[in-house]
A protein has these predicted regions:
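Short, well-formed alpha-helical segments that are part of the catalytic scaffolds
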Residues: 12-25
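Acidic helix N-cap motif at the loop->helix transition within catalytic regions
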Residues: 17, 42-50, 99
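A conserved acidic beta->alpha catalytic loop
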Residues: 22, 37-48, 94
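Short beta-strand/loop segment that forms part of the nucleotide-sugar
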Residues: 30-40, 60-64
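Short aromatic/hydrophobic "clamp" motif used to bind/position activated sugar donors
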Residues: 87
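Conserved donor NDP-sugar-binding/catalytic core segment of glycosyltransferases
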Residues: 99-147
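Acidic donor-binding loop at a coil-to-helix junction in glycosyltransferase catalytic cores
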Residues: 182, 203-210
């Protein structure tokens, strides 16, 4: 098994189904899927059971009871259930382009984690995307998006699907090479070395916090936001609040000031 793809989800079966269809047509086939389920109802379990029989890749469903936003805890549990030494992390609202897994494997390197991004779609187009659109890669084509009402902008260059342009844009982009939960990957040993995700973190920078501790441990990162492409399906974010952001930022500031590597409340506590 070359890689484990860890996908977070919470009560969003329509989006998760589209995402899993995207992983069923990847150019790289040697991977497993680990669903990190933050307390969804049985509807998600039923979907995974239905799709598992059709997929050539193994799907592992890791679930815990719903006690509010506990993404970091379920991610830590999913890491422990994974069967590969290299892990890709993404979300259940991000449909991968066919070469998504291939690109992560192509650019992986000892001593580095990979930092990707997403191409955000409005809710109207998110709902329009069909199984055929995913299998045929229509939803990654600028012509299809434009026909369906998407207004092209400078970010649309992400979908040009030209490797030379992608490499150039990866090189010149001013975007920080942070750990982004919707599209990042790294070696399991490097994640375990910092004790995984911080269980105290709620929504807002919880993924980047782990990446910052990896930097404190001497890790470097590569920018692949124009090479490993996924499209983001729109949704509400009722679990975010200014108070939560304030607490998360306080933790990150403390880590930076004190060069914290291992969290005291991480993967060894789940």
């Amino acid at each position: 098994m070359k890689v484990s793809v860890i996908i977070t989800t919470y009560n969003a079966v329509d989006w998760l189904q589209k995402v899993l269809i995207g992983y069923s047509v990847q150019t790289e086939s040697d991977f497993e899927i680990v669903i990190a389920d933050d307390g969804s109802t049985s509807e998600t379990k039923d979907l995974i059971s239905k799709l598992s029989s059709k997929f050539k890749n193994p799907i592992i469903h890791v679930w815990h009871e719903d006690h509010g936003f506990q993404k970091t805890k379920i991610l830590n549990k999913a890491i422990l259930k994974s069967n590969s030494d290299y892990l890709i992390f993404t979300d259940g609202d991000c449909i991968p382009r066919k070469d998504f897994v291939e690109m992560h494997l192509k650019y992986r390197e000892i001593g580095y984690f990979l930092s990707g991004g997403y191409f955000k779609l409005p809710l109207s187009i998110s709902k329009l995307i069909s199984e055929k659109d995913i299998i045929d890669s229509n939803c990654f084509k600028l012509s299809w998006l434009k026909i369906n009402g998407f207004k092209l902008n400078f970010k649309s260059i992400k979908l040009t699907n030209n490797r030379y342009i992608a490499q150039f844009m990866n090189w010149i982009t001013p975007t920080k090479r942070s750990w982004n939960g919707h599209n990042s990957s790294g070696w399991k040993c490097d994640i375990l070395a910092v004790n995984g995700f911080n269980n105290e973190m709620q929504y807002g920078g919880e993924d980047r916090e782990m990446g910052e501790r990896m930097f404190n441990n001497g890790m470097l990162s590569k920018q692949i936001r124009y090479s490993a492409i996924c499209i983001h399906l729109d949704h509400s974010r009722g679990y975010s609040s200014p108070e939560i952001w304030k607490n998360n930022n306080k933790i990150r500031a403390y880590n930076k000031k004190n060069s914290i590597i291992k969290t005291d409340n991480g993967i060894d506590k789940v």
